[in-house]
């Protein structure tokens, strides 16, 4: 249900902003005196007087003038948002977004009838395809053009690709309203409605077209990089025949796929759209914070799509180093780096759901991990009822596994080794698994020698010729405990020390925290054991 205030504003159309007998430079505002409906009115004489006094040093700091100035700011923002909404309803979000992007009109100025005409003409030009014309690669010299409207005349001037500061807030406001409208529609979608109504959904103001238009606004605002990276990850997820970013267009590969897709395939596609819609609520929440005065986010956790065992508020996932599958699906795993070089993949214990376990297995197979190191003790696995996915034979979605135990004699039976065969379609891969059965949570291993021995075992695991270190997220060891921060960070740091005992452990910890989250290597006793291992290695190399 719409709030009462929103319902009152719904009666305002573009014609509401045209006032006969009023100067074209008179400030407009939304009034609601003596009526249950809002209406557009010219600024009152008393308000003009207070505005004039606010320009005089003697009066501008008085309480009445300062209060008036704040009221004017709120009024200006409200009427601009309402006007842009009226424009959007008539010309569509894409035309309004493009016009705001390309226009150099100052959106911080009070809304007047002159400004109403200028913005409307700019949107009409965008709606008529003028934006596309000046963006066309054949139009040399106007690739980075801006529309400048003066007295109704339109000309083209050079500018960079970033939207002007005065247009950022209106763009975000339109995107916020668009997301609030489209997300519930996407959540209500099912396979039948997708097949029957796709053309409507992917055109005009349909939810899929509208969604892509609103999300496109973010890459025009440099400060919104984290938000843009987040939505880019979501748009790059493969659904059916193409990436989700292509689902806002009719007549292409997506529409042809929908026509031929089975009921099961459509159900799976809708399932992905539902989880993406849920993730987009995080973007809406960030927009709300920005609207309330917060700065653009400087960091963001990556989308988890329901695959993570823990909430990102507990175990953060750096979106810049988040691992993604070949179909674009992000998994709750990060690439740990030290000194700019990948060390290992790190994550929490896989969530005990079919989708999460399938994604985890696909990652092991696609990334051809040199080994899988499970650091969760046997006691903890039983106490928390964690799935022993790495031993036995299972089918997780499209992935089939068959794991055979190789040995358990090493280090007094503390480490079990398995060879786990993975298959998915035509792809096959066998990965060695090391299960450390006696490493308590938040504590070090029983001995420093066992930590060094384990590091050697991980480094020497080299299945199918995969290198132990890589320049990408392939052919790296995959390490996890329960949360993927303490024991996992300790194991990865031990690998760094085996490569170079002179490595600065404080810097290793800092780099791991930058590449995954600020909880990496958080347990003091485990860090002390790393220092002891480093001392042993340095003594050995010196002798």
From Swiss-Prot:
This is Secreted effector protein SptP. Residues 35-139 are annotated as: Chaperone-binding. The gene is sptP. Forms a complex with SicP. The active site is at 481 (phosphocysteine intermediate). It comes from Salmonella paratyphi A (strain ATCC 9150 / SARB42). Residues 315-543 form the Tyrosine-protein phosphatase domain. It is an enzyme of class 3 (hydrolase). It is found in: Secreted; Host cytoplasm. Effector proteins function to alter host cell physiology and promote bacterial survival in host tissues. This protein includes tyrosine phosphatase and GTPase activating protein (GAP) activities. After bacterial internalization, GAP mediates the reversal of the cytoskeletal changes induced by SopE. This function is independent of its tyrosine phosphatase activity, which remains unclear. One of its GO terms (molecular function) is GTPase activator activity.
